[in-house]
C-alpha cells in the first residue's frame, strides 16, 4: 500500500511561510542543543566531574558497544515505521521531550565522585539513552525531504535549513561567553573575588536553556509541518541488506 495525499502536484509550492519558518527554527535550535553538548562535553568530563582516563576509556567502549546494538534496533524501527501522520514527523515529535531531558542529564551528574561504579553506571545509562535519542530525533532533519513533492521547493528548503543550522551550531559559544561573565573569578590564593556561580552551574544553566528552547521550537515545528510525499509501507528486513554486505568479497578484503 502507498500513502497518498489529496494533491501531489510537483509543479507548485506546498509549504507555507509559517510552516517553513517553524521548521527552520525547530531544527535550528536542535542543532544548537546538539552543538552545546558536543562542543563542551569533553571539558565537562575532564574538568568538572574529573573522570579519570581509565574510566573514560571504559565509558567510551561500553557506550560504543551498547550504542551499536541500540542504534541498530532504532534504525530498524524507523525504517519500518509508518504512522497515520507521517513517517518521520511523529518520531521527532514524541522523542523531543525525552531528548531534552537526557541531553540535560549529560551535564548533570548527581555524584560527588564520578569515579565510582554507581556514577559510572549512571554515566553509561545516560550516554546510551542520549545517543539513541539522537538517532530518533534526527528524523526531524529527514522530514524536510518529504514535506513537498516539488524538487525546487525541496532544495530551497534544504538550503535554507542547512544555512540556518550552521549558524545555530555556533550559538552555544555565544551562550557560554555571556554566562561566563557571571562565573566565579578567583584571585591567586583561590578565593572568590566576583561572580555568582561555578563553571559547573554555568554549564547546567546554559544546557537547560538550550534544552527548553529546543523542546519548545521542535514541538511547535513538528505540529505544524506536513509530510506530503507518499512512501511505501512494505517492511524490509535489515538482515537481508547485511547478508549482501557479508557476501561481498570487497567487504572482507577491506576488513582484513
Kindly give the residue locations of the regions a language model identified.
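Membrane-embedded alpha-helical bundles of multi-pass transporters/translocases
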Residues: 2-256
Amino acid at each position: 500500500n502507498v500513502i497518498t495525499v489529496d494533491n501531489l502536484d510537483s509543479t507548485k509550492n506546498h509549504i507555507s511561510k509559517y510552516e517553513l519558518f517553524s521548521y527552520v527554527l525547530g531544527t535550528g535550535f536542535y542543532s544548537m542543543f546538539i552543538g552545546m553538548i558536543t562542543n563542551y562535553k569533553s571539558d565537562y568530563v575532564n574538568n568538572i566531574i574529573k573522570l579519570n582516563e581509565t574510566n573514560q576509556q571504559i565509558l567510551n567502549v561500553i557506550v560504543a558497544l551498547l550504542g551499536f546494538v541500540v542504534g541498530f534496533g532504532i534504525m530498524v524501527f524507523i525504517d519500518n515505521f509508518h504512522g497515520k501522520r507521517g513517517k518521520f514527523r511523529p518520531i521527532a515529535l514524541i522523542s523531543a521531550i525525552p531528548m531534552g531531558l537526557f541531553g540535560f542529564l549529560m551535564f548533570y551528574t548527581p555524584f560527588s565522585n564520578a569515579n565510582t561504579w554507581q556514577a559510572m553506571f549512571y554515566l553509561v545509562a545516560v550516554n546510551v539513552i542520549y545517543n539513541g535519542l539522537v538517532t530518533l530525533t534526527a528524523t526531524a532533519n529527514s522530514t524536510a525531504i518529504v514535506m513537498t513533492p516539488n524538487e525546487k521547493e525541496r532544495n530551497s528548503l534544504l538550503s535554507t535549513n542547512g544555512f540556518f543550522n550552521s549558524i545555530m551550531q555556533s550559538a552555544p559559544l555565544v551562550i557560554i561567553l555571556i554566562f561566563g561573565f557571571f562565573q566565579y573569578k578567583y584571585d591567586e590564593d583561590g578565593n572568590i573575588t566576583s561572580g555568582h556561580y561555578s563553571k559547573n552551574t554555568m554549564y547546567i544553566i546554559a544546557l537547560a536553556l538550550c534544552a527548553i528552547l529546543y523542546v519548545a521550537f521542535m514541538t511547535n515545528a513538528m505540529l505544524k509541518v506536513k509530510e506530503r510525499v507518499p512512501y511505501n509501507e512494505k517492511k524490509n528486513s535489515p538482515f537481508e541488506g547485511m547478508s549482501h554486505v557479508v557476501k561481498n568479497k570487497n567487504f572482507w578484503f577491506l576488513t582484513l
